[in-house]
Amino acid sequence: LILFFCLAQLWGCRAVPHGPILGYREPACDDVETEQAALAAVDYINKHLPRGYKHTLNQVDSVKVWPRRPAGEVFDIEIDTLETTCHVLDPTPLANCSVRQLTEHAVEGDCDFHVLKQDGQFSVLFAKCDSSPDSAEDVHKVCPNCPLLAPLNDSRVVHAAESALAAFNAQSNGSYLQLVEISRAQLVPLSASVSVEFAVAVTDCVAKEAYSPTKCNLLVEKQYGFCKGTVTAKVNEEDVAVTCTVFQTQPVVLQPQPAGADAGATPVVDAAATASPLADVPAASLVVGPMVVAVPPGIPPVHRSHYDLRHSFSGVASVESASGEAFHVGKTPKGAQPSIPAADGSVPVVRPCPGRIRHFKI
């Protein structure tokens, strides 16, 4: 009986197919394909940020490419980003946005993404990010007298934003602007001033006639703007300097319609509003791919000095990841790896990562 059992086990082992086990490959972090996946990830960040500033790619730290059945590949990619000076509501293309410099107290993002490539198209399956300002020590090494980021709920910051917006509305011949969010602030001790940046929305009231601002409503076709102000304390008074830019609404690019469809007038929407869920999604929600996921209560923290990316990208998978075979990062044998010949002609296995730094490292 024991001999029969052993023979059965041996026959079962012979019956197992010895096909190859699919593994991952590790392309260079600066490969064209890797950069395409990274740029798709950055585009995803900027389209789903509800507040704060757009981010741009700074460096690809690592990348693994896994096969995905029934079709496509998944890029498991880690990237570093830097905050730009463009607010998320600003329709300015990212390529035209300046990176915030070290002397301005720069902010860096650190993100992990799973990006699907299928039929030449990239789509995000999973996103997890966090961001943080440069350390005070590093800022002062570069610029000893440069001001640091201040908490956005600091009473001096709130007062500066309200005073700057009130001053602008008082001098404006256009629509009354309403505060949307305070985005950034710095306390400047040498001049006893507060520098503040904030987003605004256009209302249906005329600025100089808005005697009851609470009765003013946002436009049906929402339109946003961005302001920068400085409030300087003087003896028994304060000086206020402020500039505001209202973003232009842009026409929708219509898709081809079936024959007989109603060819009405082209609707006009705010490009900045479509780039962010702020206008259409409740404050307690965020958009992740094609789905809306509730954010855990109590965030973002009250005493924040910037909008941390982790409050929008906390590792929630997109609905797209449910299509086809699920993707899981596992301990699978590697596939063919790129290599760089050594001076003696041997070919050591070298993974050319991390990639180049596009701006500066924090």
Swiss-Prot record:
It is found in: Secreted. The modification Phosphoserine is found at S131, S132, S135, S314, S318, S321, S323. It comes from the Eukaryota. Gene3D superfamilies: 3.10.450.10. One of its GO terms (molecular function) is endopeptidase inhibitor activity. Phosphorylated by FAM20C in the extracellular medium. Residues 1-15 form the signal peptide. It holds the Pfam family Cystatin. One of its GO terms (biological process) is regulation of inflammatory response. SMART domains: CY. Disulfide bonds join C29-C353, C86-C97, C111-C129, C143-C146, C205-C216, C227-C244. InterPro entries: Cystatin_dom, Cystatin_Fetuin_A, Cystatin_sf, Kininogen_Fetuin_HRG, Prot_inh_fetuin_CS. Keywords: Disulfide bond, Glycoprotein, Phosphoprotein, Repeat, Secreted, Signal. Residues 24-130, 141-252 form the Cystatin fetuin-A-type domain. One of its GO terms (cellular component) is extracellular region. Belongs to the fetuin family. This is Alpha-2-HS-glycoprotein. It comes from Sus scrofa (Pig). The lineage of its organism: Eukaryota, Metazoa, Chordata, Craniata, Vertebrata. The gene is AHSG.
